């Protein structure tokens, strides 16, 4: 993940878990050890689309979903893949083999949320902790 993406992730996570929407650029810069200009840069696009509202001394995550959707549209998942394999089985069968510690992502996740896939898909992505990767390899 790029630095600006870690800022977006943090803003979304804090909003979701702690219901905190008001932040300062200096506070985030200190938290991550980034420069204030890096944090400021991370807020440019979300501000343009109305996800973030900047005030003189702070900013507010105004629209959680806009930031989430924007991040999803620009995120490069391929960089975060730490294990890749091929299985000739059907998609539903592969999804059934994912260990209980795994969290579905992308199309697999959407097909569970909406009870139907948003489109045909041929890859299964999921998140899993590093210590559980061996379970996924089996």
Where are these regions (language model features)?
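A short, conserved structural fragment
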Residues: 47-57
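A broadly conserved amphipathic alpha-helix scaffold signal in soluble, globular proteins
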Residues: 9-12, 26, 44
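Short acidic, hydrophobic short linear motifs in intrinsically disordered regions
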Residues: 17-30
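Short gly/ser-rich loop at a beta-strand->alpha-helix junction or flexible surface loop bordering the NTP-binding
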Residues: 78-138
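Short amphipathic alpha-helical interface segments
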Residues: 5-18
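Short, cationic-aromatic polyanion-contact patches
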Residues: 1-5, 24, 57-77
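Short coil turns linking two alpha-helices in DNA-binding domains
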Residues: 24, 34-42
């Amino acid at each position: 993940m790029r630095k600006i993406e870690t800022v977006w992730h943090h803003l979304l996570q804090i909003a979701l878990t702690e219901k905190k929407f008001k932040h300062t650029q200096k506070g985030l810069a200190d938290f991550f050890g980034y420069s204030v200009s890096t944090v400021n840069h991370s807020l440019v696009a979300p501000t343009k689309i109305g996800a973030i509202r900047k005030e003189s001394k702070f900013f507010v995550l105004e629209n959680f979903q806009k930031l989430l959707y924007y991040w999803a549209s620009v995120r490069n998942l391929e960089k975060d893949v730490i294990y890749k394999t091929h299985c000739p089985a059907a998609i539903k069968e592969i999804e059934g083999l994912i260990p209980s510690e795994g969290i579905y992502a992308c199309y697999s996740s959407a097909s569970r949320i909406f009870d139907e896939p948003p489109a045909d898909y041929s890859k299964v992505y999921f998140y899993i902790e590093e210590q559980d990767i061996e379970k996924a390899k089996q």
